[in-house]
């Protein structure tokens, strides 16, 4: 779709170090999408780490907006594990499950991607689905891993021409939340729920 130079950027990406509140902010937004009238359909994915007794953290992917309290949930898919560093990666989960969760999005909805990091570096179909979403009109709210700029696809996401990038800190997260909330819900109140943000 051709966009004019004055068109607001339709997608929002959060970048911050761990424990800064990226996921908490995204979950607050999702809660409001469910409470709205009408509610906004949620698509995409979220990831969660589960700490094990052996010190290993196992990472699972879930459909965005669903409960992530149980790694044994039928909606959970194993992504890999870490123990100070990445131990293993299940690229097939990104390529099949993750790609399907992104491509299932329909107009009028919101695509959540929380979070995009370095484990998916070999998942070409998954990364293509991400960039296709960023090239599209269905609004995206994503978080990306904070890095030193050495991971090419993360830099491409942050610098995508239709992305509004927020570098989140403990000091600015309330202000950022207010801006994002306004961007997502202002068009809905004006009856433009099938347009980009």
What is each PLM-predicted segment?
Residues 30-84:
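N-terminal phosphate/diphosphate-binding loop that engages ATP/GTP or pyrophosphate donors
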Residues 22:
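Conserved lysine of the Walker
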Residues 25, 29:
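Hydrophobic positions on the alpha1 helix immediately C-terminal to the Walker A/P-loop
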Residues 2-9:
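Phosphate-binding P-loop
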Residues 81-131:
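Phosphate-binding/switch loop-helix module in NTP-utilizing enzymes
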């Amino acid at each position: 779709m051709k966009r004019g130079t004055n068109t607001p950027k339709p997608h929002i990406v959060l970048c911050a170090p761990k424990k800064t509140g990226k996921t908490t902010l995204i979950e607050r937004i999702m809660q409001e999408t469910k409470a709205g009238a009408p509610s906004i359909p949620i698509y995409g994915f979220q990831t969660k780490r589960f700490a094990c007794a052996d010190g290993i953290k196992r990472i699972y992917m879930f459909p965005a907006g669903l409960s992530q309290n149980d790694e044994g949930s039928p909606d959970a898919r194993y992504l890999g594990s870490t123990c100070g560093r990445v131990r293993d990666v299940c690229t097939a989960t990104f390529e099949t499950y993750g790609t399907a969760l992104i491509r299932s999005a329909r107009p009028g909805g919101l695509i959540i991607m929380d979070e995009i990091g370095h484990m998916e570096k070999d998942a070409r179909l998954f990364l293509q689905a991400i960039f296709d979403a960023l090239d599209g009109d269905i609004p995206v709210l994503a978080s990306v891993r904070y890095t030193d700029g050495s991971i090419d696809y993360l830099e491409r996401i942050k610098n995508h021409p239709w992305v509004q990038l927020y570098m989140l800190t403990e000091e600015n997260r309330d202000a950022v939340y207010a801006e994002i909330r306004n961007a997502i819900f202002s068009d809905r109140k004006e009856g433009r729920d099938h347009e980009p943000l």
